[in-house]
From Swiss-Prot:
Positions of GTP binding: 60-67, 82-84, 112-116
Compartments it resides in: Golgi apparatus membrane; Cytoplasm; Nucleus; Cytoplasm, Perinuclear region
GO cellular component: cytoplasmic vesicle; cytosol; Golgi apparatus; Golgi membrane; nucleus; perinuclear region of cytoplasm; plasma membrane
Catalytic activity: GTP + H2O = GDP + phosphate + H(+)
Role played: Interferon (IFN)-inducible GTPase that plays important roles in innate immunity against a diverse range of bacterial, viral and protozoan pathogens. Negatively regulates the antiviral response by inhibiting activation of IRF7 transcription factor.
Name the record gives this protein: Guanylate-binding protein 4
Keywords of the record: Coiled coil, Cytoplasm, Golgi apparatus, GTP-binding, Hydrolase, Immunity, Innate immunity, Membrane, Nucleotide-binding, Nucleus, Ubl conjugation
Organism: Homo sapiens (Human)
Pfam families: GBP, GBP_C
Length: 640
């Protein structure tokens, strides 16, 4: 693999400017004086990454060459300190964010952890926390060891047996449920065991085997009931139970020259063993191709920003003496992400309305049609970026925000229309106004002359395009301003008899009344259009909410089914290995999963309750609430 040159905060093709590229790793979680702290500068970097992340964490005993593999993934010869001396270099967890080579619009986050089992550490408990954090944060978890996967190697992996005490899936598990750790496999990362300086032949009973088969054979339980054997089996059991997907890579010794081994980052590749380089490339190729995007339960995609929140939440829990809990972390994440989802959706609405609207619109309906399209997109943005909005608190905020913004656009439209119409009417009536001031109509027959010129103004005004929603109201105000003038001209017209004047006055009053009625009908029509727009908003929110709930249900169902498949596979393997009792112990977990799957398949009543709650919030929040009651009842009725 050629070296990839990276520059700090320089955008590359396919890598948005907001996603800054790191020139070198930075400490993410510092382990100083037996205290874990999150580095604020590292959080600033994560905060700028809005892309989904693929998180690869590596752990292992100190001085086993972990950092070399991570530098290789970053496309650099050096970066993570290799720690070739007796003193281990990496303290805490170090992070390097680079563009993903094979997943467009994704960021690869590499996490290198301090070596486990360092004799200089006064508190070995921190090793356990580093191990647990690496599991919680990663989508691919790499365990690095030396020589072979034997009894000693598995004993050194005792940290995996402590995970049940260091991690919680749920904040308040029910007493009748299986152990909390039974759910680990639903959200734990893929497990990759890398074995360095491997000298054995990959054979079993004289037959060639793959690296993966070598790992699975090493994880088989040892028969026997004495405590020593049971302790030896614990890491094997935990790895098989907790990690659904497992992979193994073995590496030859990179070189036999000890001097080179101490300075691997400075050794030209031609001086390293060719087979070792091929094995390293295979490992990197697998990561780039198969390492998954980091997700939380129910398919919540983790971005760089979200990863930063998770780090802080987990480390805060550890420092407070509590146990990091996935459910609590997701809740904390939702409280930060959901307001941002509301803002993002509202901004999208404003931007699209501003781009698509040409004020003044010819009719109110034209504006409402654009509003409906922009609102639909904004709701989709909110649904995509929000989660765990269980009380619909943030959905209500979005409804409120968009309604206010819509009201602002309606007001701007009215103001633009009124301003334009007044200017046009003033221009068209200039000659009429001048004639009145000069007394042109104060002559016998002047009333007819006045009416003709006024009618011409009205006709010319009618021909003005795109006057907008205030066209009639502005005209009506203008005509109203002419009533006294017309009455004065009429009374002073000596060419008309008293009877003709009375008829003319009555005709003027009738025309004015008709104009008033026309204006009233127009306002009623607009009110009806606004009400219909509210109904469309209600229908759109409810439809997208229903779609999101259905997607969440399907995600949960797939999650349960994958976990059930994994449990059944473990149970089958236990039976094959003649561990009947351990196989039977899985029955409770398997039966509970089957019940959850059936319950999830038939969740219509629960979904209807959620939709009913959302419907009630929508009805109260949207203007014209009482008129929407029937719409809500009809919508829910159609879903029963």
């Amino acid at each position: 693999m050629g070296e990839r040159t990276l520059h700090a905060a320089v955008p590359t093709p396919g890598y948005p400017e907001s996603e800054s590229i790191m020139m070198a790793p930075i400490c993410l979680v510092e382990n100083q004086e037996e205290q874990l702290t999150v580095n604020s500068k590292a959080l600033e970097i994560l905060d700028k990454i809005s892309q989904p992340v693929v998180v690869v964490a590596i752990v292992g005993l100190y001085r086993t060459g972990k950092s070399y593999l991570m530098n290789r993934l970053a496309g650099k010869r050096n970066g993570f300190p290799l720690g070739s001396t007796v003193q281990s270099e990496t303290k805490g967890i170090w992070m390097w964010c680079v563009p993903h080579l094979s997943k467009p619009n994704h960021t690869l986050v590499l996490l290198d952890t301090e070596g486990l089992g360092d004799v200089e550490k006064s508190n070995p408990k921190n090793d356990s926390w580093i191990f647990a954090l690496a599991v919680l944060l990663s989508s691919s978890f790499v365990y690095n060891s030396v020589s072979t996967i034997n009894h000693q190697a598995l004993e050194q992996l005792h940290y995996v047996t402590e995970l049940a005490e260091l991690i919680r899936a749920k904040s308040c598990p029910r007493p009748d449920e299986a152990e909390d750790s039974s759910e680990f496999a639903s959200f734990f990362p893929d497990f990759i065991w890398t074995v360095r300086d491997f000298t054995l032949e990959l054979k079993l009973d004289g037959n060639p085997i793959t690296e993966d088969e070598y790992l699975e054979n090493a994880l088989k339980l040892i028969p026997g009931k004495n405590p020593k054997i049971q302790n030896s089996n614990m890491p094997r059991e935990c790895i098989r139970h907790f990690f659904r997907k497992r992979k193994c890579f073995v590496f030859d010794r990179p070189t036999n020259d000890k001097q080179y081994l101490n300075h691997m980052d400075e050794v030209p590749e031609e001086n390293l063993e060719r087979h070792f380089l091929m094995q390293s490339d295979n490992f990197c190729s697998y990561i780039f191709t198969h390492a998954k995007t980091k997700t939380l339960r129910e398919g919540i995609i983790v971005t760089g920003k979200r990863l930063g929140t998770l780090v802080v939440t987990y480390v805060d829990a550890i420092n407070s003496g509590a146990v990091p809990c996935l459910e609590n972390a997701v809740t904390a994440l939702a409280q930060l992400e959901n307001p941002a989802a509301v803002q993002r959706a509202a901004d999208h609405y404003s931007q699209q309305m501003a781009q698509q609207l040409r004020l003044p619109t010819d009719t109110l309906q034209e504006l409402l049609d654009v509003h409906a399209a922009c609102e639909r997109e904004a709701i989709a943005v909110f649904m995509e970026h929000s989660f765990k909005d269980e009380n619909h608190e943030f959905q209500k905020k979005l409804v409120d925000t968009i309604e206010k913004k819509k009201g602002d656009f309606v007001l701007q439209n009215e103001e633009a229309s009124a301003k334009y119409c007044q200017a046009e009417l003033k221009r068209l009536s200039e000659h009429l106004t001048e004639s009145i001031l000069r007394g042109i109509f104060s002559v016998p027959g002047g009333h007819n002359l006045y009416l003709e010129e006024k009618k011409q103004v009205e006709w010319d005004y009618k021909l003005v395009p795109r006057k907008g929603v205030k066209a009639n109201e502005v005209l009506q105000n203008f005509l109203q301003s002419q009533v006294v003038v017309e009455e004065s001209i009429l009374q002073s017209d000596k060419a008309l008899t008293a009877g003709e004047k009375a008829i003319a006055a009555e005709r003027a009053m009738k025309e004015a009344a008709e104009k008033e009625q026309e204006l009233l009908r127009e306002k009623q029509k607009e009110q009806q259009q606004m009400m219909e727009a509210q109904e469309r908003s209600f229908q759109e929110y409810m439809a997208q909410m229903e779609k999101k709930l259905e997607e969440e249900r399907e995600n949960l169902l797939r999650e349960h089914e994958r976990l059930l498949k994994h449990k059944l596979k473990v149970q089958e393997e236990m039976l094959k290995e003649e561990f009947q009792k351990k196989s039977e112990q899985l029955n409770k977990e398997i039966n509970q999963l089957k019940e959850k799957i059936e319950s999830t398949k038939n969740e219509q009543l629960r979904l209807l309750k959620i939709l009913d709650m959302a419907s009630n919030i929508m009805i109260v929040t949207l203007p014209g609430a009482s008129k929407l009651l029937g719409v809500g009842t009809k919508y829910l009725g159609s879903r029963i």
